[in-house]
Design a protein with these regions (language model features):
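Juxtadomain coupling helices with adjacent low-complexity linkers
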Residues: 1-17, 21, 109-140
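Structured interaction and signal-relay segments at domain junctions
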Residues: 2-93
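Glycine-rich loops and low-complexity Gly/Arg-rich segments
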Residues: 51-54, 60-62, 96-100, 122-123, ...
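Sensory/regulatory domains in signal-transduction proteins
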Residues: 66-131
């Protein structure tokens, strides 16, 4: 069990607080790509693997886990390295800011700020630099 799974109720509270403060959806995964917390469609997927659990893959979350760098995807549907943009519930991911959760230089997981509609996408695009700084501070 990962550290984030051990504190899953707190992880879920953080996801909900970020979503309320920022106005976008939040997905939090651990270092094995297990969804540990989230809002909207991600809450329904807690316990499932993101990106099929392929931590050596080339999609967004696997890259962020490997590199430790924040990535900002402005057009998820047309970004071939993003991954699947629609889930079983029919929600389309339009944009995302994804940053690693670090402790003592170890990557514990990822926080993703996700736009599922144009209003949320506008929030991520309009406040790009501030949103990146915000999510990086939350992940520290």
């Amino acid at each position: 069990m990962s550290l984030l799974e051990e504190i899953a109720p707190s992880v879920q509270q953080v996801a909900e607080a970020i979503a309320l403060a920022v106005g976008v959806e939040v997905e939090i995964v651990d270092n094995q790509l297990t969804i540990v917390g989230g809002t909207s469609v991600y809450m329904q997927r807690i316990g499932e693997k993101e990106e099929s659990g392929e931590i050596d893959g080339n999609y967004l979350y696997a890259r962020v886990l490997r590199t430790g760098n924040t990535e900002y995807i402005t057009d998820a549907q047309n970004d071939q390295t993003y991954g699947i943009t629609v889930d079983a519930f029919g929600s389309f991911e339009l944009a995302e800011i994804c940053t690693p959760i670090k402790a003592d230089e170890h990557i514990l997981g990822i926080i993703g700020l996700v736009a599922l509609n144009e209003d949320q996408r506008s929030i991520l695009l309009d406040k790009n630099k501030n949103m990146v700084k915000f999510v990086e501070k939350m992940a520290d």
